């Protein structure tokens, strides 16, 4: 989605504001 990214890293769900 525009303005943010959500991704699964090392077994953890991470939300990175961009």
UniProtKB/Swiss-Prot annotation:
Q: What class of enzyme is it?
A: isomerase
Query: Which reaction(s) are listed as its catalytic activity?
Result: ATP-independent breakage of single-stranded DNA, followed by passage and rejoining
State if Metal-binding is listed as a keyword: no
Its name, as the record gives it, is DNA topoisomerase 1
**Which Pfam family is an annotated match for this chain, by its short name?**
Zn_Ribbon_Topo
Stated role: Releases the supercoiling and torsional tension of DNA, which is introduced during the DNA replication and transcription, by transiently cleaving and rejoining one strand of the DNA duplex. Introduces a single-strand break via transesterification at a target site in duplex DNA. The scissile phosphodiester is attacked by the catalytic tyrosine of the enzyme, resulting in the formation of a DNA-(5'-phosphotyrosyl)-enzyme intermediate and the expulsion of a 3'-OH DNA strand. The free DNA strand then undergoes passage around the unbroken strand, thus removing DNA supercoils.
Q: Which UniProt keywords apply?
A: DNA-binding, Isomerase, Topoisomerase
Gene Ontology terms for molecular function: DNA binding; DNA topoisomerase type I (single strand cut, ATP-independent) activity
Instruction: Say which family it is in.
Output: Belongs to the type IA topoisomerase family.
Q: What is its EC number?
A: 5.6.2.1
| Record note on quaternary structure | Monomer.
Task: Please name the GO terms of the biological process aspect recorded for this protein, alphabetically.
Answer: DNA topological change
